[in-house]
Each structure stands twice: as structure tokens, then as C-alpha cells.
């Protein structure tokens, strides 16, 4: 018994009806999920188009190419409409998200309190700016040092009486925490040939009993210049220019002093608010120090100066106790 033969016109009408129904459903789909369900319903393996195509075997052989062409045309049409509707829905979804996440720029912002530069750091920056303007290069070195760089290379051997002038933090491995930034000068001179002009800022450590003017950890800045023909007059001119930039037009005096790594040496005072304040030590680099780094003291001379940053900051900001710098008291820090 043979299968009944379908009429070509009947199957063609089914394809036309499917197209009209599918296009209407696609055009009214409101979500991407709904659109995907329509794709499966019409074009899936068990979809309506597949069910119609399954009937093609009952058509006369001569009608099958015609129905096949109509079916392929319908499939391409539906795929195009599905993709176009998908693009539209995606654009609408993005637009809705942007609208929901939009910011009203007229609304008041959330206040974020501003921080302040610590008075020690602002003082360091100000001092470095002055010396960089005078042609000096900023140099840095390690805070953990060897006895050689901290003492011996600076003309302070183990049996030198000046060792008793500083109480030092020694570490278990035999190294120490530097007591001054002069060690940076030695390291720099070992690496570079004259002429050199450097300014070396950094933390230093000494076994001082803490009080209003002393701290075990403090900041120091030192300068060093080495060249042919430098004299004490050049040192005085540099120091005077620096102090005038920092404090303004104030009286300055130099007093003879002693440091193991400079000869001659001097202390420098400024007259501030009616009294003399000691602000730094300085001097001509001892020839022995130049020899230690391989410089010929018959050809080169140099000068150096060093001072504590805390002392300068206390004078500039009229702070009465060095310990205020390290308490992290916002009532104090907000003043700067």
C-alpha cells in the first residue's frame, strides 16, 4: 500500500502561513529569551519548519525542488529577521542599563577630606629644591651601614676619640644603623670622579634620650662639593645663599668647631627672633677622606655641610617639641 501523495499547493500554503505567523511573533518579541524560544520553535530540529519539510517525501518528485526552494527562502528570511530583532533588543537593553546607571552631575558630591604633606617632608622638599637650584644632585644611600662607610672612611678609625661622641645602634651581624648621611658621600665619591655636587637626605639613628629637642630617629641632609680650587669662601657663599633662601635676610655667623672628616670646621648660627640658633656644621673635606675614595688631595678640594631637618622644621613652623612630628596627631598635622 503506497503513501498518499500530497498536493504541492497545500504544502506551499503551509509555508506561507508559517512565514506570516513567525514574522509576526518575531516582531513582537520583547526579550532576548523570548526571541530564542521563537527560534527553537520555528527553526529548531523539532520546529515547525522541520515538520513541514518532513512531508516533502510525500510530494511528487517533480514538485520537491519547488517546495525545497520555498523552504530555504523562508529559513533565510526568518534568520535575518531573528538577527535584526536580536540587535534591536540588545541595543534597547544597553540603553536601559545606561539610563539606570546614569549620574546626575548636579547632585552634591561625597566629601573626601584632603590630606596634608607632613611638615618634615615639606621641609625636606623645600631644602632639596634650593640645592637642586644651585646645581646639586640628590643622592641616597642605605640606612644600614658598615663601620667602614659610617666611620673609618670618614677619618674616624676604631681608636679615634670621636667614636665616643656618638652612641650607635649596632646590629647582630656587625653592621649598624647610620648615624649621619655622610656615608652617602663616601659611596658617591667611590662611584664618580670630580667635579661632584650632591645633596643627601635621609633618616639617621642615634642612642639619644628622647626629649623636646632630641630623638633616636631623625632626618639629616648633607651637601658635598668636590672640584679643583674650592675654598672656604665657596663654602661660606653656598651656606649663606642657602640660609637666605630658607630664612630670608637674617644675620649669620660662623664659629670654629671640630669634626673628624673636615678641616677647618665650623658651626653656623642664624639670628632668629632675637636669639642665635645653631643650625648646621660645615667645613673643608679632610684630605684623608679624599684619599680614602681615591681622589688626589693635591688636585682636588671639597667642602661639606650637614644639618638636622627637624631643627629647621621646628624653627620655620615654631614647633616647641620634636616629638610632635612622630605622634600622628591629626590636630597637629592639620595645621600644615
Curated annotation (Swiss-Prot):
Source taxon at top rank: Bacteria
Keyword annotations: Aminoacyl-tRNA synthetase, ATP-binding, Cytoplasm, Ligase, Magnesium, Metal-binding, Nucleotide-binding, Protein biosynthesis
Main location: cytoplasm
InterPro entries cross-referenced by the UniProt entry: aa-tRNA-synth_II, aa-tRNA-synth_II/BPL/LPL, Phe-tRNA-synth_IIc_asu, Phe-tRNA_ligase_II_N, Phe_tRNA_ligase_alpha1_bac, Phenylalanyl-tRNA_Synthase, tRNA-bd_arm
GO terms (BP aspect): phenylalanyl-tRNA aminoacylation
Location relative to the cell: Cytoplasm
Catalytic activity: tRNA(Phe) + L-phenylalanine + ATP = L-phenylalanyl-tRNA(Phe) + AMP + diphosphate + H(+)
E.C. designation(s): 6.1.1.20
Protein biosynthesis in keyword set: yes
Cofactor names: Mg(2+)
Protein family membership: Belongs to the class-II aminoacyl-tRNA synthetase family. Phe-tRNA synthetase alpha subunit type 1 subfamily.
Name this protein carries in UniProt: Phenylalanine--tRNA ligase alpha subunit
Organism: Thermosynechococcus vestitus (strain NIES-2133 / IAM M-273 / BP-1)
Taxonomic placement: Bacteria, Bacillati, Cyanobacteriota, Cyanophyceae, Acaryochloridales
Gene assigned in the entry: pheS
Amino acid at each position: 500500500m503506497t503513501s498518499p501523495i500530497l498536493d504541492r499547493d497545500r504544502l506551499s500554503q503551509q509555508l506561507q502561513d508559517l512565514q506570516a505567523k513567525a514574522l509576526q511573533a518575531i516582531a513582537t518579541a520583547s526579550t532576548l529569551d523570548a526571541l530564542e524560544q521563537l527560534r527553537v520553535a520555528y527553526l529548531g530540529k523539532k520546529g515547525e519548519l522541520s515538520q513541514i519539510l518532513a512531508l516533502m517525501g510525500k510530494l511528487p518528485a517533480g514538485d520537491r525542488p519547488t517546495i525545497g526552494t520555498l523552504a530555504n527562502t523562508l529559513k533565510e528570511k526568518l534568520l535575518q529577521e531573528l538577527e535584526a530583532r536580536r540587535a534591536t533588543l540588545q541595543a534597547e537593553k544597553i540603553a536601559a542599563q545606561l539610563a539606570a546607571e546614569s549620574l546626575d552631575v548636579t547632585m552634591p558630591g561625597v566629601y573626601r577630606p584632603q590630606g596634608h604633606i607632613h611638615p618634615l617632608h615639606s621641609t625636606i622638599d623645600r631644602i632639596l629644591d634650593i640645592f637642586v637650584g644651585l646645581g646639586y644632585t640628590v643622592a641616597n644611600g642605605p640606612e644600614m651601614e658598615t663601620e667602614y662607610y659610617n666611620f673609618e672612611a670618614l677619618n674616624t678609625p676604631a681608636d679615634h676619640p670621636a667614636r665616643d661622641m656618638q652612641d650607635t645602634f649596632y646590629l647582630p651581624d656587625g653592621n649598624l644603623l647610620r648615624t649621619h648621611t655622610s656615608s652617602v658621600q663616601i659611596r658617591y665619591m667611590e662611584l664618580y670622579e670630580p667635579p661632584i655636587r650632591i645633596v643627601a637626605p635621609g633618616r639617621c639613628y642615634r642612642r639619644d634620650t628622647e626629649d623636646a629637642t632630641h630623638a633616636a630617629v631623625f632626618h639629616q641632609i648633607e651637601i658635598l662639593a668636590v672640584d679643583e680650587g674650592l675654598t672656604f669662601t665657596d663654602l661660606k657663599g653656598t651656606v649663606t645663599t642657602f640660609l637666605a633662601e630658607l630664612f630670608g635676610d637674617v644675620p649669620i655667623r660662623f664659629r670654629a668647631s671640630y669634626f673628624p672628616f673636615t678641616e677647618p670646621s665650623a658651626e653656623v648660627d642664624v639670628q632668629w627672633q632675637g636669639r642665635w640658633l645653631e643650625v648646621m656644621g660645615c667645613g673643608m673635606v679632610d684630605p684623608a677622606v679624599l684619599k680614602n675614595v681615591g681622589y688626589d688631595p693635591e688636585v682636588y678640594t671639597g667642602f661639606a655641610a650637614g644639618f638636622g631637618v627637624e631643627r629647621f622644621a621646628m624653627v620655620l613652623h615654631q614647633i616647641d617639641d620634636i616629638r610632635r612630628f612622630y605622634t600622628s596627631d591629626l590636630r597637629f598635622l592639620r595645621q600644615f
